């Protein structure tokens, strides 16, 4: 099993009602290019993280065609909200529309046991939109501070749920191990050592976790506090930003996955 990520698909129906090539020729036919790479590299057993700005639609019913396009692609898909996802609705409404085809995350975290080339591994993941950070040139304390603080709360909620999900998964694996070791002699040999199985924490955000100066923020504090291994985010679309993003912040690896930054391919995270 592999883990991929991409953000900022900016879909608008087929044919698109808002073609992205208005932002430059590099966006020409971008969804077809993404789909080709996706279909050729991702299997149904893989995980795909979608970190916001999926559709230009304003309402959930208008976004349905874009979401169904995404759902038709291979892999188990997890999606967070971006700043342009105005169609985003309640969890129940989105679940009723898409069923199990896409799992929508907002201040939510979970964990899964996956099989990688290096062996079994637990990945804990979750996230939310995040927001502009104090010190950013577009940040206004009067209007943005409360939104920033709300997104910090959602981020911490996701991180706490990730930790609880890991504990629950380990308890389940322990119970299964005990059952197998006390079972019949015909039991299959164990392939998972719960004491040595590594855990990787992946935080999904739409906005980067810092301002234009890459200064520490409440998001980076949470990354340190909860020992996040990798933070995956999008939102950025200019060469200056592409060049300024560091590879790491503290002990957390950073992965920028805006579609145009990735040249309209998916980034393999694991």
Describe the function of each predicted region.
Residues 2, 16-116, 215-226, 257-258:
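Core catalytic region of metal-dependent phosphoesterases/phosphodiesterases
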Residues 19-21, 60, 66-69, 132-142, ...:
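Active-site-proximal segments of metal-dependent phosphoesterases and phosphodiesterases across multiple
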Residues 16-21, 35-36, 92, 110-119, ...:
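Binuclear metal-dependent phosphoesterase catalytic core
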Residues 45, 74-76, 120-122, 196-200, ...:
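A general structural motif
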Residues 6, 51, 80, 204, ...:
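Generic enzyme active-site microenvironment
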Residues 2-13, 122-134, 202-204, 253-258:
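Active-site-proximal beta-strand elements of phosphoester/diester hydrolases
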Residues 24-28, 119-183, 189-194, 269:
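Binuclear metal-dependent hydrolase catalytic cores centered on His/Asp/Glu-rich metal-binding motifs
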Residues 10-15, 55-61, 83-91, 111-112, ...:
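Active-site environment of divalent metal-dependent phosphoester hydrolases
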């Amino acid at each position: 099993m592999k883990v991929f990520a991409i953000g900022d698909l900016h879909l608008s129906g087929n044919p698109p009602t808002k073609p992205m090539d208005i932002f430059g020729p590099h966006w020409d036919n971008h969804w077809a290019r993404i789909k080709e790479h996706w279909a050729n590299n991702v299997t149904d057993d893989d995980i795909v993280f979608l970190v916001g700005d999926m559709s230009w639609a304003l309402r959930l019913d208008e976004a349905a065609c874009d979401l169904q396009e995404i759902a038709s692609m291979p892999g188990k898909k997890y999606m967070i909200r971006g700043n342009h996802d105005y169609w985003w609705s309640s969890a129940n409404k989105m679940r009723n529309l898409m069923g199990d085809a896409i799992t929508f995350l907002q201040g939510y975290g979970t964990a899964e046991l996956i099989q990688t080339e290096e062996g079994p591994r637990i990945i804990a993941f979750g996230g939310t939109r995040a927001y502009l950070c104090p010190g950013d040139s577009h940040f206004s304390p009067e209007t943005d501070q409360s939104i920033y603080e709300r997104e910090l709360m959602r981020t911490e909620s996701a991180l706490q749920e990730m930790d609880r999900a890991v504990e629950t998964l380990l308890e389940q694996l322990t119970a299964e191990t005990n059952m197998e070791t006390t079972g019949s002699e015909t039991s299959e040999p164990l392939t998972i050592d719960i004491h040595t199985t590594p855990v990787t924490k992946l935080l999904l955000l739409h906005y980067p976790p810092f301002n234009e100066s890459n200064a520490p923020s409440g998001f980076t504090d949470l990354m340190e506090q909860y020992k996040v291994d990798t933070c995956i985010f999008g939102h950025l679309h200019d060469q200056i930003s592409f060049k300024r993003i560091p590879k790491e912040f503290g002990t957390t690896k950073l992965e920028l996955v805006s579609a145009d930054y990735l040249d309209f391919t998916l980034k393999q995270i694991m």
